């Protein structure tokens, strides 16, 4: 049984394109559907930039790019995936903490996460860890989406999630084109940028790297990324990642996630960089020890 059966054309038609190739970083949870009672129900946490390809690799085995710990212990279902991470580094850190809750400094205030409870399933244990992770920093500041890929596993979270996080259902697809299929993901029109930051009034030296503008197309806001982040964090001392706020120029409501998405769409990602990034990242395979917890 395969969460992404290549011959299941009906499920292909129901997939939602959520990101451009080169802009997707997800941390997923697999559950074994093996008939062998030694493996059935075991779980695996992993990272991917291409969920459809990754589940195929896991089910095909080590020789085809799958992980050692999932080889010959399936078939596997990819039951859920957390995505919306700003880059692969943040996603890999999230993956590691989910795999190793007893070692993560972010989760040290939850000693109950160190071990699976006696009658708790491996899935319930992983889900309990995730519920706590999404409520602590820095992850509770990120514009993450929790996507259920298999409705049979779907359930309410043990703890309330931050209001800016989405809980959605359905298969996920990554577009190789330069545009997503949804209207809000169209490449923005060219922007007439100012040469100076509206907040610090200093010259923007590396505009492609450090410049941000408002999501309102009629607004001429031009800022250093750090200046705008600090401005939006004005009412939230002690944090480093803004969730959103009001534009200092047009007073339009801003979402930090939307600002970064707009920046990426304006810059684009060269084909050679997209291919290199995906090939490099998919070679990173940190085995999860969660399924071996007594």
UniProtKB/Swiss-Prot annotation:
GO BP terms, alphabetized: double-strand break repair via homologous recombination
Primary localization: nucleus
Cofactor(s), by name: a divalent metal cation
Pfam families: GIY-YIG, SLX1_C
Keywords recorded for this protein, A-Z: DNA damage, DNA recombination, DNA repair, Endonuclease, Hydrolase, Metal-binding, Nuclease, Nucleus, Zinc, Zinc-finger
Gene Ontology MF, one: 5'-flap endonuclease activity
Domain GIY-YIG residues, every copy: 23-109
Record-listed E.C. numbers: 3.1.-.-
InterPro entries xref list: GIY-YIG_endonuc, GIY-YIG_endonuc_sf, Slx1, SLX1_C, SLX1_endonuclease, Znf_RING/FYVE/PHD
Gene3D superfamilies hit by this protein: GIY-YIG endonuclease, Zinc/RING finger domain, C3HC4 (zinc finger)
Residue spans, zinc finger SLX1-type: 197-250
EC class name: hydrolase
Keyword hit for DNA repair: yes
Signal peptide: none
Cellular component GO terms, alphabetical: Slx1-Slx4 complex
Compartment(s) where it occurs, according to its Swiss-Prot or TrEMBL record: Nucleus
Record-stated family: Belongs to the SLX1 family.
Self-association and partners: Forms a heterodimer with mus312/SLX4.
Task performed by this protein: Catalytic subunit of a heterodimeric structure-specific endonuclease that resolves DNA secondary structures generated during DNA repair and recombination. Has endonuclease activity towards branched DNA substrates, introducing single-strand cuts in duplex DNA close to junctions with ss-DNA.
Protein name: Structure-specific endonuclease subunit SLX1 homolog
């Amino acid at each position: 049984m395969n969460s992404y059966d290549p011959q299941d054309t009906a499920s292909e038609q129901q997939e939602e394109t959520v990101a451009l190739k080169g802009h997707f970083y997800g941390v997923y949870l697999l559950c074994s559907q093996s008939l062998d009672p030694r493996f059935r129900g075991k779980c695996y946490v992993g990272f991917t930039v291409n969920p459809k390809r990754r589940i195929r690799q896991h089910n095909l085995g080590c020789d085809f790019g799958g992980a050692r710990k999932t080889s010959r212990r399936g078939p596997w279902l990819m039951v859920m995936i957390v995505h919306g991470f700003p880059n692969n580094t943040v996603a890999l850190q999230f993956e590691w903490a989910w795999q190793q809750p007893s070692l993560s400094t972010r989760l040290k205030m939850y000693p109950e996460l160190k071990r699976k409870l006696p009658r708790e399933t491996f899935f319930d244990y992983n889900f309990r860890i995730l519920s706590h992770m999404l409520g602590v920093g820095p992850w509770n500041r990120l514009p993450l989406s929790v996507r259920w890929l298999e409705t049979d596993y779907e359930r309410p979270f043990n703890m309330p999630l931050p209001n800016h996080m989405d809980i959605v259902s359905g298969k996920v697809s990554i577009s190789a084109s330069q545009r997503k299929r949804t209207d809000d993901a169209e490449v923005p029109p060219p922007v007439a940028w100012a040469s100076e930051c509206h907040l610090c009034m200093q010259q923007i030296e590396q505009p492609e790297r450090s410049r941000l503008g408002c999501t309102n197309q009629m607004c001429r806001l031009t800022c250093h990324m750090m200046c705008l982040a600090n401005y939006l964090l004005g009412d939230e001392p002690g944090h480093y990642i803004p969730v959103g706020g009001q534009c200092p120029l047009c007073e339009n409501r801003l979402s930090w996630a939307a600002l970064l998405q707009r920046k990426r769409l304006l810059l684009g990602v060269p084909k050679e960089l997209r291919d290199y990034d995906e090939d490099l990242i998919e070679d990173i395979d940190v085995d999860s020890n969660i399924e071996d917890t007594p």
